[in-house]
């Protein structure tokens, strides 16, 4: 479980887990000891990592597992507008495949099975900083500064 929750590289992050980790491309805006601020499209996302070794403006990837994304109304965190591309019902859960921007891959969101989302509907996604990962241009993970128990 340690590799799943604390991948040291993009390779490990994408290899372990099904559905796989979502990766969103962005640029580093700010790096402090306890967090980094990343621009993804028109959104600024806070990530609980130490990225001080990276240069401002560096190309980075923000990683988030499908079960660590909430749909609007489910709590705080950064909001990203998306549109539902496909819904896969699995019984007790559903997978929402959403598009968060023309330059981003389809993002997978795991929700409970009672989701009533409709194709093409607009959804606001909540990304909580403590569940996000940050990978540099070489695919190496930045050290997380807020560790949740696993």
List where the protein language model places each region:
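Short acidic-hydrophobic catalytic motif
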Residues: 1-5, 13-16
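ABC ATPase "signature
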Residues: 5-9, 31
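Non-catalytic connector elements of ABC transporters
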Residues: 19-150
């Amino acid at each position: 479980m340690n590799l799943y929750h604390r991948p040291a590289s993009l390779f490990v992050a994408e290899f372990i887990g099904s559905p796989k980790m979502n990766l969103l491309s962005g640029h580093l805006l700010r790096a402090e000891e306890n967090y980094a601020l990343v621009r993804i499209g028109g959104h600024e996302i806070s990530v609980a990592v130490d990225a001080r070794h990276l240069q401002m403006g560096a190309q980075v990837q923000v990683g988030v597992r499908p079960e660590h994304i909430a749909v609007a109304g489910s709590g705080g965190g950064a909001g990203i507008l998306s549109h539902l591309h496909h819904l896969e019902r699995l019984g007790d859960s559903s997978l929402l495949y959403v598009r968060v921007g023309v330059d981003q891959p389809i993002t997978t969101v795991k929700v409970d099975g009672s989701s009533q989302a409709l194709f093409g509907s607009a959804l606001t996604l909540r990304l909580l900083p403590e569940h996000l990962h940050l990978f540099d241009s070489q695919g190496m993970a930045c050290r997380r500064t807020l560790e949740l128990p696993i």
